[in-house]
């Protein structure tokens, strides 16, 4: 892939969305992971200024992720704000009768979304998305949480391609080497949740997307079954709410 042209196209896309909406800039959640780090880097290249980063950890958030996110803010000279959301999460736990790790993770994602949109309104800015194509196809995200945003410059890149672009743009090796994680609970990792590495997941997703029957026959049947199940079960996450026509 021609990463120079792709980078230019992404930066043009960001500039166009901000200009056409008559916004001042963009707001994003910076987790310390590679996806949000890449989007922050692209925003800085595209806009130069008015890129606002929110770091919103809980008490179980990986401290290394916070350190990496802070370092990136300094390196890119971003305006940023740290908001500890544990107190909000604790209030939810007190009111809920049956909290699980998944429900807590989803609620944390929706807290972050609410804070981003509140700040974006205050700053007349757009919330920018950080989900990659692998996550979007699988519905691996929280509806009205991290899947809520005005636009997304990296949603056409598979996770494996995210790494390639990050290397091209010289992102710090900490982002490239760390294990992918939504950091929803302690020691949580994407690949443990999904049951396969992103390399295998992307291979399967590409085979399904292109209907490569030859490749589909030799791939792990349990991988293909998992992908199809998640794509079907979570397809609603990528659609607007249906409205009855009368």
Swiss-Prot record:
**Residues holding Mg(2+):** 35, 135
* Cellular-component GO terms for this entry: cytoplasm
MF terms (GO), sorted A to Z: ATP binding; glutaminase activity; metal ion binding; NAD+ synthase (glutamine-hydrolyzing) activity; NAD+ synthase activity
Q: Does the keyword Metal-binding apply?
A: yes
State the EC number(s): 6.3.1.5
Is Magnesium set as a keyword in this record? Answer: yes
> Which residues of the sequence carry a binding annotation for ATP?
29-36, 130, 159, 181
Q: In which pathway is this protein known to take part?
A: Cofactor biosynthesis; NAD(+) biosynthesis; NAD(+) from deamido-NAD(+) (ammonia route): step 1/1
Gene Ontology biological process terms in this record: NAD biosynthetic process
Q: Where does deamido-NAD(+) bind?
A: 110
Q: Catalytic activity annotated for this protein?
A: deamido-NAD(+) + NH4(+) + ATP = AMP + diphosphate + NAD(+) + H(+)
Q: What InterPro entries is this protein classified in? A: NAD/GMP_synthase, NAD_synthase, NH(3)-dep_NAD(+)_synth, Rossmann-like_a/b/a_fold
**Which keywords does this chain's UniProt record carry?**
ATP-binding, Ligase, Magnesium, Metal-binding, NAD, Nucleotide-binding
Instruction: Note the SUPFAM superfamilies from the entry.
Output: Adenine nucleotide alpha hydrolases-like
The family line of this record is: Belongs to the NAD synthetase family.
Task: Supply the NCBIfam families for this chain.
Answer: nadE, PRK13980.1
Q: What does this protein do?
A: Catalyzes the ATP-dependent amidation of deamido-NAD to form NAD. Uses ammonia as a nitrogen source.
Q: How does it associate, per the subunit comment?
A: Homodimer.
Protein name, as recorded? NH(3)-dependent NAD(+) synthetase
The protein's gene is named nadE
